[in-house]
Amino acid sequence: QQFIEQEYAQIAWLRGESAETVCEHLEKAIAQTMPEAETQRKTGILSVEEYKLLLFRWEVCFGTDRERGEKELQELTEEIFQKNFERTERVKVIPYAALLKAKTSQDGKQDTYLKMITETALENLREEGKLLYMPEILKQYAKILEKENGDAEFIQLLRQERAGILE
């Protein structure tokens, strides 16, 4: 049932339906295995898929009247990094968390943290040979390095790598 509700939410999101509609499906999905999500997060018994679901809810609510807040995203990201997930599992959630973190780091705060999680995301993607999120992470990393006047050749290499993936 959780998977079905999550898929309904994703379809509604892709169709551009209201955040309210998408959130209704997400709340139903979350309730299937995380009826006490906040408590379960504190006890540390959530799976990667459950964290992805919580991140998706955060993304859907971002910029709406249902916004979950930057604090929740920070806490989710920190929890994900503290977990001892297998590499094959980490690659499913760390890049997503890094991309969402960039949405709240536009003002120049937490640049070091954003750089660290973006580097980790890129490393995980490369180690596992995954392309999902790779172009976005490469773009984000190049932007971060550019902002701090990083190595121009390396930044160009990141952009070329991204272009090669998108071709």
Q: Where would I find each of the regions flagged by the language model?
A:
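Extended alpha-helical scaffolds
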Residues: Q1-A29, E36-T39
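Flexible helix-coil transition and linker loops at the boundaries of alpha-helical arrays
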Residues: Q1-Q2, A31-V48, E78-R90, L125-L131
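Amphipathic alpha-helical repeat scaffolds of TPR domains
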Residues: Q2-L14, K42-T64, R90-T104
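Short, well-structured alpha-helical interface segments that form or flank functional binding sites
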Residues: F3, T21-E24, R90-K92, M116, ...
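Alpha-helix C-terminal capping/termination sites
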Residues: L14-G16, C61-R66, K103-D107, E127, ...
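Alpha-helical repeat scaffolds
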Residues: S18-M34, D65-N84, K109-E123, N149-G164
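Long, low-complexity regulatory tails in eukaryotic proteins
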Residues: I94, K101-K103, Y113-E167
